[in-house]
Amino acid sequence: VITTKPCATSRDLALAYTPGVAEPCIEIKKNPDDAYKYTAKGNLVAVVSNGTAVLGLGDIGALAGKPVMEGKGVLFKRFADIDVFDIELDTKDSDELIRTVKLLEPTFGGINLEDIKGPECFYIEEELKKIMNIPVFHDDQHGTAIISAAGMLNAVEIVGKQIEKCKIVVNGAGDAGIACANLA
């Protein structure tokens, strides 16, 4: 935990915890959106995985996938100054994963699903988007699709063509391939 407010004096600590912490609690109770004002929620993302589709390694499980999720957190922090908790869930049951992530909603400002195999990843993301009031993003689908589209747009610009006149082939029907096709 990195403090964002002063914590040097007894007064500082009394504001951070008891009795001062009661004020933001009361405000958040009145208006839940104030959680983004008074807490770290707005800059905190959960990177969630069950380790069933780790790039280049396959289904290695939640614990073995932990270094990848921690690494993803480093990228979030380094390039966007977003704080991350990696959450490795030891389950292959999609509904159990969905229930667990939903229960974490009060803590996080967003959910980044990572390295969850298809076709389960489609169902999990779709259901979470229906039931959660924070952004849910499946990196392996949409991150890849966005980067692929950006690369295509840059390539078309470099060769002086119009994208509308190009034939684009999506070679593959995995999570990323389907997301690339859906983006078009």
Located regions from the model:
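Glycine-rich phosphate/diphosphate-binding loop of Rossmann-like nucleotide-binding domains
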Residues: 55, 62-80, 138, 146-184
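Acidic, glycine-rich active-site loops and adjacent beta-strand->loop/helix elements
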Residues: 51, 90-93, 142, 172-177
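N-terminal ligand-binding/catalytic initiation module
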Residues: 1-136
